[in-house]
Amino acid sequence: MPSFDIVSEVDLQEARNGVDNAVREVESRFDFRGVEATIALNDANKTIKVLSESDFQVNQLLDILRAKLLKRGIEGASLDVPDEFVHSSKTWYVEAKLKQGIESAVQKKIVKLIKDSKLKVQAQIQGEEIRVTGKSRDDLQSVMALVRGGDLGQPFQFKNFRD
């Protein structure tokens, strides 16, 4: 029986490349000359720290970062940015987390979405991914379109497609 897995992963190498591109653009922009503005990726806990001298500049840096990550194939929804920025002495910063894996609440929504579609497929939650099996390839492709179309708050990838 054909099957595939629904996952939500961020390629850390592409994230590193996107951060490097954003840093290069910040260094060359006129409005950031002479200003303490940094963007740094922490591989260990999968966060990106954005630091600047004002909250407005932090927002500008986040916009630059999102644009560069999007060019590298990482959607903006996979970046979890808190609403509040942290202010310490003369700098503002925010630590944005890269979403890895699918949370259990979102997994349940996906399984419910698949079951409500009345397609002849089965969905099983396996750790941080969802295995979908069915008799026909067309049903599996319909499930892929359904999951992409459903507004669930994060991007999904499909892997391990087997016949």
From Swiss-Prot:
InterPro entries: DUF520 (IPR007551), UPF0234-like_C (IPR035571), UPF0234_N (IPR035570), YajQ-like_sf (IPR036183). GO terms for molecular function: nucleotide binding. It comes from the Bacteria. One of its GO terms (cellular component) is cytosol. Disulfide bonds: none annotated. Keywords: Nucleotide-binding. Belongs to the YajQ family. Nucleotide-binding protein. This is Nucleotide-binding protein YajQ. It comes from Salmonella paratyphi A (strain ATCC 9150 / SARB42).
